[in-house]
């Protein structure tokens, strides 16, 4: 299957794709950013681009989700876009085509293995404008970044906007990303106005964690277990009424897990 055919199928399924997005998606070959089979991608499923040394899987999102993120980013030519993670460079390459030679794409990649993969794939990619790949610690050291960004896309689940990133969003700009815990998140557009943040809820989503370390942690790790219980409890609590006594017991369990030392043996 070609990208043109895939985009046509997404449009037929009701996924909003404007001409700028369509052109960029068709132009960028996902196979350049992964060595794994693309069969799942052609069937609108996520595909891996990297397995880390600790066994965590990093994926390129399903095409419909890629198109959805691009739609909600409201990208125009010449914009400066920041990505927290870039799906192995694939998403950055698409956005680079969209912003063109007058725009910039800045990737902040927290995980070293993922960053090296991203740098390697983008090095042999013909960019339209400028793409830079940074470590989190680099952000405060590059003077140009202080001018700020109109758009920031977070490509993995987080609970809050990192302070160092929120400070770089210009007034009237916004952060788009999946906010929540490991079980479920809400795709939020968080717009910055006069120092305050205003949320637009764009629906429920399921993304892997932005922090790859969470994927590399055993599910029996006390903090990981507490996060999963809390997230699942919030999800269920939004659908059915739970007795206050039960709520209190669950909250106490979560608190107790978070107070446990991280090196407790559980094998």
Residue spans of the language-model regions?
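SAM/dcSAM-binding transferase cores
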Residues: 1-3, 149, 179-267
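Conserved nucleotide-cofactor-binding alpha/beta core module
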Residues: 70, 74-184, 191-193
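Short alpha-helical interface elements
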Residues: 31, 35, 49-53, 94-100, ...
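Short, intrinsically disordered/low-complexity patches at protein termini
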Residues: 46, 105-107, 129-131, 200, ...
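Short, structured coil/loop segments at alpha-helix boundaries
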Residues: 1-4, 15-19, 34-35, 109-111, ...
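Intrinsic-disorder/low-complexity coil detector
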Residues: 15, 45-47, 135, 260, ...
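General "foldedness" signal
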Residues: 35, 39, 56, 83, ...
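Class I SAM-dependent transferase core
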Residues: 1-98, 113-125, 206-210
């Amino acid at each position: 299957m070609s990208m043109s055919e895939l985009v046509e199928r997404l449009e037929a399924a009701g996924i909003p794709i404007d001409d700028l997005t369509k052109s960029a998606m068709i132009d960028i070959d996902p196979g350049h950013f992964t060595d794994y089979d693309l069969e799942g991608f052609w069937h609108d499923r996520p595909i891996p681009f990297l397995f880390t040394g600790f066994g965590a899987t990093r994926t390129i999102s399903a095409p419909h989700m890629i198109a959805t993120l691009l739609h909600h980013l409201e990208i125009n030519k010449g914009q400066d876009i920041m990505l927290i993670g870039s799906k192995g460079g694939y998403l950055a390459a698409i956005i680079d085509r969209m912003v063109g030679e007058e725009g910039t794409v800045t990737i902040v990649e927290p995980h070293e293995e993922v960053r090296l993969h991203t740098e390697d794939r983008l090095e042999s990619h013909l960019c339209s404008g400028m793409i830079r790949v940074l470590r989190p610690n680099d952000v405060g050291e590059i003077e140009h970044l202080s001018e700020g960004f109109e758009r920031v896309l977070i490509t993995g689940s987080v609970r809050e906007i990192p302070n160092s990133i929120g400070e770089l969003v210009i007034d009237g700009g916004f952060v788009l990303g999946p906010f929540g815990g490991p079980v479920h998140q809400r795709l939020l557009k968080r717009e910055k106005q006069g120092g305050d943040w205003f949320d637009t809820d764009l629906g429920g989503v399921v993304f892997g964690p932005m922090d790859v370390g969470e994927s590399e942690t055993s599910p029996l790790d006390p903090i990981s277990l507490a996060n999963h219980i809390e997230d699942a409890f919030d999800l269920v609590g939004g659908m059915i009424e739970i007795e206050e006594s039960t709520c209190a017991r669950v909250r106490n369990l979560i608190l107790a897990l978070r107070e446990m030392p991280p090196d407790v043996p559980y094998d």
